[in-house]
Amino acid sequence: MRTILVADDDDIFRELVIEILSTSGYKVLVARDGQEAWELLQGNPADMAVLDLNMPRMDGMELTRHIRSDERFREMPILMLTIRAMVEDQLSGYERGADDYLTKPFDQHMLLARLRVLERRILG
């Protein structure tokens, strides 16, 4: 069973993502902001991460930078899941190390398909 870190400060979206992933067979680690996610990763390694961009204390871009700079997590697939749909935001996400980018609102089948692609491509 793969473990996915979900970091989102929006209760509704966070709970929706948790429900989708849990019922699809994933173990889910949950954080309400980037700082909490980073602290959670220290003792609970995840196979993949689904990160919001706009979060208090540490946003998704900064969290991605931390993940990519840490040798333990450098290869962990990261999917940005955010309301920020501008091309500039997407490009910035990819430049900072995101492997994929999906905007809210989203289709649950598309979220799962993209995670499976990351799982196959990066995790084998």
Model-derived features: positions:
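Short hydrophobic/Thr-rich beta-strand motif most characteristic of the beta2 strand and flanking loop
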Residues: 25-32, 40
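Active-site beta3 strand of CheY-like receiver
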Residues: 45-50
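Receiver (REC) domain active-site loop signature in two-component systems and cognate sites
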Residues: 55
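Charged docking surfaces used in two-component/phosphorelay signaling
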Residues: 15-23
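C-terminal output helix
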Residues: 106-116
